[in-house]
Amino acid sequence: MPTVATSSNRETVDKYWLAVNARDWDSLAKLLDPDYVWEMPQSGERVRGEQSNREMNDNYPAGLPDIETHRITGSEDRWVTTPSWTVLKITGTGDDYVSESRVSYPDGSVWHAVDMFHFRDGKIRSQVAYFAPTLEAAEWRARWVERF
């Protein structure tokens, strides 16, 4: 089995987010293992393979989120706007990396996303993504916590 330098996997995560933002599915495909799997446990969904991933992203209702373009699509009774997606931090070592992101929707809601990447032979073998809205802090903890 080939050995992959840690920095190469980190660079691949950077390239992943750049390719997603650019909608460059050909470049993204080069980063994915042939057995790529993307899981979203909160909704109980699994995407198998690069082609399914490509087709799903091509059919995102308002286009994929980014920080440059905000498209609005919809019909008379349903409108979908594209959120802004900001990668805040990427950490990891070896074959496991995690990215933390902040997603801001046009309605003012803010969500947080965590994507866990696992590598095999320098390619992204699997990805697990968690999404959660911002929550109000519980009052009972106020005297022990610091708000940020």
Predicted regions and their residues:
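C-terminal and inter-domain tail/linker signature
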Residues: 1-148
